[in-house]
Amino acid sequence: MRSLDDPILRTVKIGVQLIGNDGANSPPAHALARRHIIENVVGYSVYGDYAQPNPTARIIEAVATGAVDVAVVWGPIASYFARSQPVPLVVVPVTPSRDTPTLPFVFDIALGVRRGEEAFRAELDAILQRRRPDINRILDEYGVPRVEMSEPRSAVQ
């Protein structure tokens, strides 16, 4: 399965992270509901039970034990916990990367500085550029999937 439009999703048990009962659910929960895939969805709290170790791992453990057939999970969580399961699990990005204009599945991470701090921003940009191989190595060690940008975006003024 590589797409939220894959017909198999209508027949398998799907684990999805849910945020709460206020309608502010995860993009995968909304995307599946838009496709009328709801009867075979099992919800797992994004927050988990912090009285237990690694509460966000429950959804990945459910795939490993067969409690669900597939899970649609944020990439860093999926990759990190999939690596420690007793059975081999495969983590693949799903498409589309944006289900609707307001429902992204890919998220940028940014670093902000105060207005007028151009020298500080330039220093941080240079450090990040210089340390990019180290940052990528650490992300690889933790199994964090990434979508590479063609080039860094310009700063917002």
Regions found by a protein language model. Name each.
Residues 1-157:
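Proline/Glycine/Serine-rich low-complexity intrinsically disordered segments
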